[in-house]
Amino acid sequence: MENRNSFLQNFRGETLGNISNESSSEEIFQNKVLRPILKLQNDLFIEVVKNQINKHKNDFYNFPVEKKLAYIEHIIKNDIKFRNSLKGIIISLFTIDEYNDYIQNSSNLNKRMMNMLIERIKNQVQLLDVVIAK
């Protein structure tokens, strides 16, 4: 397992964000594990969200920006299958130790994970405007 763990940590890159003596275990996990994974998987998340939008065949591309932002938040928070798929993309890049840390506090870490992902996608909403031809 050490090869996989080393590979994943090197592949993801350095810690993003500040870690101090006052940082909670959740903040440390967020900055050491979640942020690098979200950054690494960013392009995939954009494509996955585009696909989800197109599957629902709504009028997303004609929505005003505020409604697009609300829709992004809605599909990530309320579509359980979709949310679980997004979590799987993230969790699959955990080391065994990170996974063991994660399961100790998965509820709070899931909230952090999804909130960070929602903000990341919202900040890049213009990338979703490229319609996928089906």
Residue positions per predicted region:
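Short, well-structured hydrophobic secondary-structure segments
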Residues: 30-61
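Amphipathic protein-protein interaction modules
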Residues: 63-113
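Long, highly charged low-complexity segments enriched in Glu/Asp and Lys/Arg with interspersed Ser/Thr
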Residues: 105-134
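N-terminal leader/targeting peptides and immediately adjacent processing regions
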Residues: 1-35
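Generic hydrophobic, helix-prone segments enriched in Leu/Val/Ile
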Residues: 20, 34, 71-72, 91, ...
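Membrane-interacting alpha-helical segments
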Residues: 57-72, 124, 128-131
